[in-house]
Amino acid sequence: MPRTDNDSWDITQSVGATALGVAAARAAETESENPLISDPFARIFVDAAGKGMWSIYADPALLTKADDLEPDLRGRLQLMIDFMATRTAFFDEFFLAAADAGVRQVVILAAGLDARSWRLPWPDGTVVYELDQPKVLDFKSTTLREHGAQPKAELVNVPIDLRQDWPKALQEAGFDASRPAVWSAEGLVRYLPAQAQDLLFERIDALSVPGSRLASNVPDSGFTDPDRLARQREDMRRMRAAAAKLVDAEITDFDDLWYPEERTPVDSWLRERGWDVSTATFAELMARYGRSIPQGAQDSMPPTLYVSAQRRAG
């Protein structure tokens, strides 16, 4: 179902269901022979949610049957697992580097089923603010506490739609805009219209003093190319039809959740406002972590740029 300006969701619907897909991919990577990451909570989320489209990543028996239904389906599924594994490793390392540098305020925008508050070795005094839809945060906290898990930092949930006045809600929850903070917008930006993307980074910029850090993965050049979009849509249509047979469940058309609009380049926008910026493409990040993109699968993943930045003094 196409997005609307005031749509909402729980963990099994629309954008919320993508968080379960990410958790399933993290579970598959964690349980693999040579994992890049360790997320012991990912499997808990997937099991708690029950059967759905996310099952295809986390069930090894389904993966072995994939190519019987559609040639290259298993390769595409493995590519998605690799995508999420490298993305997770990138953000894990970003957060830990910021913590090592002494930053003790962490803001995770569109937190979804990100369990970093619960699994990363945060230094004493760290406060993590997680922002997302109320039902999503409730599912995560309730599920983890039912399994006896405890956050490894002071966790402050801020249940809010990011299209609302989240800076006000964040500060009312205790965020101190006079101190450095580390921000993440992981797996978020392509679900925002271009204007909302601009507003998101304007708000982050306004709340960031020197020493603050930011990481995000954003649409790269070519994201809106009509020929590439057509190839991606056709490729995903075939894979989605086959995957639906495997899990006996409807598979969300993720193309309907994204906004393929021309956007302000986030890296240059940040540089103009006093941030030191580093970037890596999806292919560069995959290579950095020893993963590869299968031949012919380039169009199955949207062009993605990983951005990390630090606010300069002065």
Swiss-Prot record:
GO terms for molecular function: methyltransferase activity. Its EC number is 2.1.1.-. The keyword Repeat does not apply. One of its GO terms (biological process) is methylation. Keywords: Methyltransferase, S-adenosyl-L-methionine, Transferase. Transmembrane segments: none annotated. S-adenosyl-L-methionine binds at D132, D161, L162. InterPro entries: Ppm1/Ppm2/Tcmp (IPR007213), SAM-dependent_MTases_sf (IPR029063), SAM_mthyl_Trfase_ML2640-like (IPR011610). Belongs to the UPF0677 family. Exhibits S-adenosyl-L-methionine-dependent methyltransferase activity. This is Putative S-adenosyl-L-methionine-dependent methyltransferase MAV_0301. It comes from Mycobacterium avium (strain 104).
